[in-house]
């Protein structure tokens, strides 16, 4: 399970298994590195993609399901494939959120609520029977190209004043943004693996990904 006092780097794979097979074995094993099966990756490769990730990485695997309904089945699918954490959208019905959190607890998985598109994350949390392990403050991929869109760190103190949860910062994270996230109280920074032609910010898959991972870990210490 994730620990409150540790700062984590989450590296997101959003493309295909070819990229996973090429890059993942080069990343140094570290308890502070989480490997994410991104939503586009899961849609493309299915549960088998998560399973292959788990075979290549003996650390924590995050299944970015972004569940909106059918919570129990999706959590069980991710767990059976080897994931140790999974995400649900904060905009999902409260019944779905509660079922998701309960099933994650039963399976000893870390539950993550992704607040993508949610204006007031605290209001979502106040409706729940129990809080998640992680709250994700997320600037979406499509928002990255809109000038002035930012990760809303202003919510961190509000959330942490009421709940003992970890905060994850996602969306357009580079070394500078990672430093800002930690300064503002985040516990996890999510960095996308991107191609040179993408409009998004992250670690370019053509770079020395292992070295970039080390730089991020040093930055968020």
Where are the regions a protein language model picked out?
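Conserved N-terminal beta1-alpha1 strand-loop-helix module at the mouth
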Residues: 1-63, 67-72, 204-216
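Alpha-helix-loop-beta-strand connector modules within alpha/beta enzyme cores
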Residues: 43-65, 100-117, 151-171, 206-221
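Hydrophobic faces of well-ordered beta-strands that scaffold small-molecule active sites
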Residues: 7-13, 33-37, 61-65, 86-88, ...
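Glycine-rich phosphate-binding active-site loops on the catalytic face of alpha/beta enzymes
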Residues: 83-95, 136-146, 184-212
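Conserved anion-binding
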Residues: 2-5, 73, 77-164
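A C-terminal functional module that forms or caps the active site or interfaces directly
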Residues: 154-189, 194-200
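Structural motif
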Residues: 30, 56, 81, 130, ...
């Amino acid at each position: 399970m994730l620990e409150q006092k540790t700062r984590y780097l989450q590296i997101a794979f959003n493309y295909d298994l070819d990229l996973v097979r090429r890059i993942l074995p080069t990343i140094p094993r570290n308890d502070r590195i989480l490997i994410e099966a991104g939503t586009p990756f899961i849609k493309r490769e299915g549960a088998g993609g998560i399973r292959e990730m788990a075979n290549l990485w003996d650390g924590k695997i995050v299944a970015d399901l972004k569940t909106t309904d059918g919570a129990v089945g999706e959590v069980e699918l991710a767990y059976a494939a080897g994931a140790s954490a999974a995400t649900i959208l904060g905009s999902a019905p409260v019944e779905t959120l509660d079922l998701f959190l309960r099933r994650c607890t039963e399976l000893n998985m870390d539950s993550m609520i992704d607040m993508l598109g949610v204006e007031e994350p605290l209001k979502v949390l106040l409706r729940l029977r129990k809080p998640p392990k992680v709250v994700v403050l997320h600037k979406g991929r499509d928002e990255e190209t809109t000038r002035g869109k930012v990760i809303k760190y202003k919510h961190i103190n509000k959330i942490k004043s009421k709940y003992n949860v970890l905060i994850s910062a996602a969306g357009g994270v580079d070394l500078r943004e990672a430093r800002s996230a930690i300064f503002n109280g985040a516990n996890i920074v999510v960095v996308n693996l991107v191609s040179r032609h993408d409009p998004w910010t992250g670690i370019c898959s053509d770079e020395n990904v292992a070295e970039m991972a080390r730089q991020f870990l040093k930055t968020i210490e």
